[in-house]
């Protein structure tokens, strides 16, 4: 019952149980009031004015709502629920249109919020469909500014300011809440239809019915004013789930990009691109709205970030994704010998693949070796659901994982495997290297505390305020903010205290104390436990669990942390695997970062799950005075000359499968590898990596 140019408008006004005006819908409160009236444009006549209360699931009203609307929870308790009210709305509008001999209409609302931020999100959460008429509407503020260009900007308009501009009455006390608003909007429309303006309603706003998938090229230009980052998503959420979270807003085609971590798994974040900046600004108002039981954080992002995640250059991927409106399923764990026929046979006739073999995309390494991943296209949701039922069924001798995917995830996975260089290049070190002025804690004395569950926006000042009087007991440079692999706050921090007693007191006093809107857990720990957590282990009041990179035997007894030279810290942590040194050797070494070595009899992949930010102390932010002479001593300190460090390990990723010892030694020509050790190297081959073993120490390349 809609058209691009209708003879009738339905002026619509609504209110929720929470915020009013410019913040309507920003607090997720439910709709409690709808008021509407039909306006016949050719005859300039109006139909009956209707007002309906809506019974919300939560009848608690905000103070602002009670004050502005005059409504009570008792009155709303007798009203009909939203789905019944919307049915009545359709029936009453149809009856009013028959009086004027019309059969089509378009909604007209005061701004975008009622339609986009209230009606669409709420009906989506309550799992019922809106009528087609709610997918097209006129924004009275935009139409007014088009008719009267000298009026205030669209974002500053209200019903009252528009009425004042036209010299109309603005005494709201004369009418019930909602009735005055609709009558005034009708009067504004009639003024716009007068001979002086002769305004024509021809270009309505539209709401997309569903999210459209599609590829994104790295050569595209993406406006940074149209991109947001959503954080805190359930790991199993798909692009359709995210589109549903932003229901009512127009997402660009292929505009949902789920982010992956270094292991290729989703990290709970997504970048979303909208059709324009206005839609993006409305999306930012959904900060901390809920997806199920989880609240989702929404922040601004840039076009470069979106292209980095969603953009691709492969013609094969572009052709695969060229089939629009397909459901994408990712298969993981395929046998390396699996063929297209094997995959089609595994899926079976109950879930036919779009285009047969053309609907399959195998992920391969640059040299053509399969990775065990594949993407599959299905033409409808039913076929995709049938495929997902085969999750962890057996193909060959392996179980296969199946889960929903997106066009952006296809690009990310292909980019990750296809763009790996044969010999990764590390950043050129700065000469001379300036050692960092701090050392990460080691030792078994439990003089540290761990803060877990910090707000992502929390800074050093917030942590020091949180600790209160205990700030005076923090060691110099003893505040360590922990960052994740994307360089963002992880919600953790480590604090080095002056003694174990001080750490115990802080843990007892501050545990589950509130910081902003979150409670923070505080655990006492040692420097060794702190480093274990940084490597991926877990620490809570039940104890410490080892990181996945260490075996239980390696965890059975704490070792002295290995020390690598300060200049090595310029490289990415994944590129360095140091061995342990004797206490005598490390005592004279320059300041260093800390890792844990593998056992003498075994080699485990040593990686860092989190990275500590440069630590600070209360002295650096003005909480405590620095010790006398500390600044002068730091300024006059001489840097230790760089000396060869025995036992350092260097990791090389992406080696060609047929790389020999001669090629590796040639690559390191000039780095003074001891000639006596050449004969002691033994090459161990595996499909994904190469390891060189020396008789006296491990070397991982």
Swiss-Prot record:
Gene Ontology CC: one annotated term: nucleus
Domain of life: Eukaryota
A GO molecular-function descriptor: mRNA binding
Signal sequence extent: none
Ranges for domain RRM: 226-303, 327-407, 448-523
Entry's Gene Ontology BP terms: mRNA processing; regulation of RNA splicing; RNA splicing
Main subcellular localisation: nucleus
Keywords carried by this UniProt record: mRNA processing, mRNA splicing, Nucleus, Repeat, RNA-binding
Alphabetized Gene3D superfamilies for the sequence: 3.30.70.330, Ribonuclease H-like superfamily/Ribonuclease H
Known function: mRNA splicing factor that regulates the formation of epithelial cell-specific isoforms. Specifically regulates the expression of FGFR2-IIIb, an epithelial cell-specific isoform of FGFR2. Acts by directly binding specific sequences in mRNAs. Binds the GU-rich sequence motifs in the ISE/ISS-3, a cis-element regulatory region present in the mRNA of FGFR2.
Protein family membership: Belongs to the ESRP family.
Protein name (Swiss-Prot/TrEMBL): Epithelial splicing regulatory protein 2
Upper taxonomic lineage: Eukaryota, Metazoa, Chordata, Craniata, Vertebrata
């Amino acid at each position: 019952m809609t058209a691009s140019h209708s003879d009738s408008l339905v002026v619509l006004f609504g209110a929720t149980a929470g915020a009013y005006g410019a913040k309507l819908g920003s607090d997720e409160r439910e709709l409690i009031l709808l008021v509407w009236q039909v306006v016949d444009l050719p005859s300039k006549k109006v139909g009956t004015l209707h007002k309906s209360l809506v019974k919300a699931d939560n009848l608690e009203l905000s103070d602002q709502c009670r004050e502005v609307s005059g409504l009570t929870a008792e009155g709303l308790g007798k009203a009909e629920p939203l789905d019944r009210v919307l049915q009545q709305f359709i029936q009453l509008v149809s009856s009013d249109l028959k009086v004027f001999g019309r059969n089509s209409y378009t909604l007209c609302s005061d701004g975008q919020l009622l339609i986009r931020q209230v009606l669409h999100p709420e009906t989506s959460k309550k799992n019922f469909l809106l009528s087609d008429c709610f997918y097209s509407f006129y924004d009275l503020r935009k139409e007014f500014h088009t008719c009267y260009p000298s009026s205030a900007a669209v974002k500053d308009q209200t019903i009252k300011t528009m009425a004042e501009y036209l010299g109309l009455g603005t005494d709201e006390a004369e009418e019930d809440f909602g009735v005055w608003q609709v009558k005034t909007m009708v009067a504004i429309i009639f003024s716009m239809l007068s001979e002086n303006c002769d305004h024509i309603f021809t270009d309505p706003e539209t709401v997309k019915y569903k999210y459209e998938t599609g590829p994104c090229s790295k050569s595209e230009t993406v406006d940074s004013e149209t991109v947001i980052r959503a954080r805190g998503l359930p790991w199993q959420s798909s692009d359709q789930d995210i589109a549903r979270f932003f229901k009512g807003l127009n997402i660009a085609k292929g505009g949902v990009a789920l982010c992956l971590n270094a292991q290729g798994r989703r990290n709970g974040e997504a970048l979303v691109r909208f059709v324009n900046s206005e839609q993006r600004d409305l999306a930012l108002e959904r900060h901390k709205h809920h997806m199920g039981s989880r609240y989702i954080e929404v922040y601004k992002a840039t076009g470069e970030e979106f292209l980095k995640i969603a953009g691709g250059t492969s013609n094969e991927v572009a052709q695969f994704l060229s089939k629009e409106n397909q459901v994408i399923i990712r298969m993981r764990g395929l046998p390396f010998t699996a063929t297209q026929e094997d995959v089609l046979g595994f899926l079976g006739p109950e879930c036919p693949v779009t285009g047969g073999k053309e609907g399959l995309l195998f992920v391969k390494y640059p040299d053509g070796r399969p990775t065990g991943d594949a993407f599959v296209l299905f033409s409808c949701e039913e076929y995709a659901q049938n495929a997902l039922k085969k999750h962890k069924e057996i193909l060959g001798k392996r179980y296969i994982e199946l889960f929903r995917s997106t066009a952006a995830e296809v690009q990310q996975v292909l980019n990750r495997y296809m763009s790996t260089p044969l010999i990764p290049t590390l950043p050129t070190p700065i000469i001379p290297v300036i050692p960092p002025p701090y050392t990460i804690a080691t030792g078994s004395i439990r003089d540290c505390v761990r803060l877990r569950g910090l707000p992502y926006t929390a800074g050093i000042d917030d942590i020091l305020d949180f600790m209160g009087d205990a700030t005076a007991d923090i060691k110099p440079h003893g505040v360590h903010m922990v960052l994740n692999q994307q360089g963002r706050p992880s919600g953790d921090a480590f604090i080095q205290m002056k003694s174990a007693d001080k750490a115990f007191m802080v843990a007892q006093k501050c545990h589950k104390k509130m910081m902003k809107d979150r409670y923070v857990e505080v655990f006492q720990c040692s420097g060794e436990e702190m480093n274990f957590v940084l490597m991926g282990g877990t620490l809570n009041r039940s104890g410490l669990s080892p990181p996945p990179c260490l075996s239980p035997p390696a965890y059975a007894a704490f070792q002295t942390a290995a020390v690598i030279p300060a200049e090595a810290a310029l490289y990415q942590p994944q590129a360095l695997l140091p061995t342990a040194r004797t206490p005598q050797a490390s005592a004279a070494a320059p300041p260093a970062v800390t890792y844990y070595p593998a056992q003498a009899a075994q080699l485990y992949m040593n990686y860092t799950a989190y990275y500590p930010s440069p630590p600070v102390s209360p002295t650096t932010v003005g909480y405590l005075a620095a010790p006398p002479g500390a600044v002068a001593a730091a300024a006059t300190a001489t840097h230790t000359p760089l000396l060869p460090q025995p036992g350092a390990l260097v990791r090389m990723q992406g080696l060609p499968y047929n790389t020999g010892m001669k090629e590796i030694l040639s690559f390191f020509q000039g780095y003074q590898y001891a000639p006596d050790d050449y004969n002691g190297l033994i090459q161990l081959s595996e499909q994904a990596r190469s390891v060189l073993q020396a008789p006296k120490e491990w070397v991982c390349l």
